[in-house]
Amino acid sequence: MEEFPGYFELDRSRQHDFLYPLIFRESIYALAHDHGLNRNRSTLFENEVDYDKKYSLIIVKRLITRMYQRNHLIISANGSVQNPFWGHNKNLYSKILSEGFAVIVEIPFSLRVLSSFERKEKDIAKSPTLRSIHSIFPFLEDQFSHLDYLSHVLIPYPIHLEIAVQTLRYWVKDASSLHLLRIFLHEYWNSFSTPKKHITLFLKGNSRFFLFLYNSYVCEYESIFLFIRNQSSHFQSTSSGVFFERILFYVKIDHLVEVFVGTDFLDIRSFFKDPNMHYVRYQGKSILASKDTPLLMNKWKYYLVNLWQYHFSVWSQPGRININQLGKYSLDFLGYFSNVQLKSSVVRNQTLENSFLINNAMKKLETTVPILPLIGSLSRAKFCNALGHPISKPTRTDSSDSDIIDRFVRICRNLSHYHSGSSKKKSLYRIKYILRLSCVKTLARKHKSSVRAFLKRLGSELGDEFLTEEGVVLAVIFPKASGRLYRGRIWYLDIPCINDRVGDAEGSIFTK
């Protein structure tokens, strides 16, 4: 939003009054499509097929007018919705409005985030590495080795539409915008017959707006959860994110406590007293880990179920939240299989007369790379077949030799970079072998030569291309280990995000 600094210069006390007029600003939709102020490209076009026509805010105004004129909350007796409003272009029209909504309702969030950053600029400057995905793994290594039980929880979604709008009321105080947003959500949700279908279409066509609603819901849920956790714990949380102020927050907390246990807040604080409760969220899931007995984990499990059911009207079955022992459970976490194993350490004790060995058992977090899912991803991206045998990439034969090699090297480098924390390196060596041989087969196919002849011509140069950068990095970090193959784990603190579409050849980690 740096292209539009004028929107962020609004007076703090009046900023919410300006949100509704922004719906009719063409620059908002240019920002939504990341086209700057270029008015030759947008989805605000008259024809659904022609993407090069000029902006037409007449469509937006017409849609909003017709939405206000209709009674959208009336549903027929058989449960179906007769919706002539959207017509054949319902996906297009909903996308037009959702893109504008997404940018506009993000403005109050962005203003508060910027002000929060200004207050904590020095603290943020000291810890830029905490934004890396790999930064969570050293934390798990330090903490999980001392814990005993773990619950892997899927955060339920979607919530009720009115709950979503009420959640946004604490952020967006513009009544007109909220009213229009409520109308749009009801109209859009009722346009589809099954929940599964509308969620899929909503995610594909309106990912920015979908993520905004989801993040606001998660922010609300975690605000309550971490508030109770911090108040009930012997030690305050030091790694939780920034949660902004909202109206009547403490009133809601008190009401939630009454609904849950029917007692005062001091009782619930002692009810959940635990100095070793840890919470991690990632990719729509959360992890709860604790020490000693599973009794406390059971209490937190039912607390979460009641929180979702009574506060967000989302159904969640307690039986689907399992409590597992860390020593007997392998956690599929951000592309790694993680589990806690007992490692024996033998120490020789020498006295004047006797010497004896002491075997100490120590817990250690092991992280390994799941080789089969990686091979499946490479297979879907056409680097190998389903059995893991390398194949050529015919779509790349039109490129130059240097471009082909650079592309394969970049893919191999990204995979090695992200999975460098694996305790076992053999799976990574197999992935490198697949990519290297796929590159050779692609070059041989381009030059109409055999793989054997092409390898003889290249010699060891191609292998050096795939291994050079990793060797340089290790030589800088571990000078003593540079002369031999380093087998230890390395966590990089410069990976802010990854793409979840690991099977998509054009949108996965393989193309970065």
Swiss-Prot record:
Q: Which UniProt keywords apply?
A: Chloroplast, mRNA processing, Plastid, RNA-binding, tRNA processing
What Gene Ontology terms describe what this protein does at the molecular function level? RNA binding
On the tree of life, the source organism's domain of life is Eukaryota
Q: Which InterPro entries match?
A: Domain_X (IPR024937), Maturase_MatK (IPR002866), Maturase_MatK_N (IPR024942)
Principal localization?
A: plastid
GO cellular component labels: chloroplast
Q: Does the keyword Magnesium apply?
A: no
Tell me the compartments it is located in. Answer: Plastid, Chloroplast
- Give GO terms for biological process: mRNA processing; RNA splicing; tRNA processing
Identify its protein family: Belongs to the intron maturase 2 family. MatK subfamily.
User: Function of this protein?
Assistant: Usually encoded in the trnK tRNA gene intron. Probably assists in splicing its own and other chloroplast group II introns.
PANTHER family for this protein: MATURASE K
Protein name per the record: Maturase K
Encoded by which gene?
Answer: matK
